[in-house]
Amino acid sequence: MNRSEASTHLDKVLANVDANIDASLARLFDLIRIPSVSTDPAHAPDCKRAAEWLKKELGELGFDASVRPTARHPMVVGHDRTGQGPHVLFYGHYDVQPVDPRGLWHSDPFEPKLVPQPDGETHIVARGASDDKGQLLTFVEACRAWKAVAGSLPIQVSVLFEGEEEISSPSLPPFLDTTGAELKADVVLVCDTDMWDAETPAVTTMLRGVLKEEIVISCSNRDLHSGIYGNAARNPLQVLSDIVASLRTPDGGVAVQGFYDGVTELPDAIKAQWQRLPFDDKGFLGDIGLSIPAGESGRSVLEQVWARPSCEIHGIIGGYTEEGFKTVIPAKAQSKISFRLVAGQDPEKIRDAFRAHVRAHIPADCSVEFIDHGASAATVMPIDGAFLTKALGALTEEWEREAAVAGSGGSIPIVSAFKEKLGMDSLLIGFARFDNRIHSPNEKYDLSSFRKGIRSWARILAAFAHDKG
């Protein structure tokens, strides 16, 4: 199906989505009712049941679908290669977070409720409504509408649904190693992110990477009495404090030598679009009781959190911290430190540079141990890519607002895995809202997000169709 043919079907496809929204919602409710909590071994049968449910739905749509075992929870793989033109891989996850604390839920977490709101919106309240079952099904239901109207999809589609995203996807990298050739596509589509706001869709094209390190400073061979050894003995807490203080520059940058090697400036076009976004720097910080940005001076808050690397201290441990007072010089002190990375930074080179920086600050009679807590590289989608351009256009048509090109200060290891192992870029297109309470009691997904999410994917599939028949 070429783009002209897809365009002739699109209005009927969108009408089909609207006419069948109740049936789509019923299917979502069926999936939500399966308590596929991946972290709890007691729910392993439920994870398998959710995978089988998805396989069945895909099979009914004409996908060649199968459930693939892993060391823990199964993958669901489906292919519909009957279409022409580009080949996309859609990724989602069927596992959910635990519901604790159960007492804070207003209703059964696995019995979805439609809750009308004063503003006219309706919330779908249940665990997994937003993260990620509701989001995942927006794509499946868009495929269903295309099949019902046109008999086929406008493009070639593969899907990968996993059941371990909420536990950091331990089975995904080895699965990609063995199944990568089958899953290789022109682009990955991920529906597990937020819109910019309730009316403005967004495509996330950049994710920061992360490097997590723990350092342990050892000095004396036992804890010491400060009245006897103070001044004469090295205090590892002081050594650690000096190291931590040395990591940042006065203007908010990172002082590790070579840290910014390979880091490039944000394109002017992206800076200009971010400046047009309705974002309030003062409000962003005011919500958390702060008022002054702490990152590199001369850069906007969005640039600081989306497009610049950072260093954060997450914990300092050592000495006496219980009630009362104890005048001890501890034998050891430790800290947990992470670096958010951007495109152009190699996590292993940053690790080496950080460790060299720390070693340079270790005095005689003291030693340091490093504990590696993992790392992943940043990912960036080319801003002039055809898939991004077409997706932005389709989203803008559906929402009647210019779709935003967004970044994310966080890290999604699966996106790095798709890039590193299969060489595939990812477009992150989600319809959640910042107030959806994912991972918290009373998680919700807006009914309008579900409906317009389905319509958005229907438009994107049409937009991706090739130009000529």
Regions found by a protein language model. Give the residues of each.
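Active-site metal-coordination/substrate-binding segment of hydrolases
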Residues: 85-161, 452
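N-terminal helical capping/dimerization or prosegment-like subdomains
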Residues: 2-102, 332, 336, 349
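Histidine/acidic-residue-rich, glycine-tolerant segments that coordinate divalent metal ions
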Residues: 154-234
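Acidic-enriched catalytic cores of C-N bond-cleaving enzymes acting on peptides and small amides
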Residues: 205, 226-316, 345-367
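A short beta-alpha structural unit
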Residues: 38, 339-342, 369-384
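Generic non-transmembrane alpha-helical segments
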Residues: 16, 27-30, 57-61, 145, ...
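C-terminal catalytic subdomain
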Residues: 242, 318, 323, 327-353
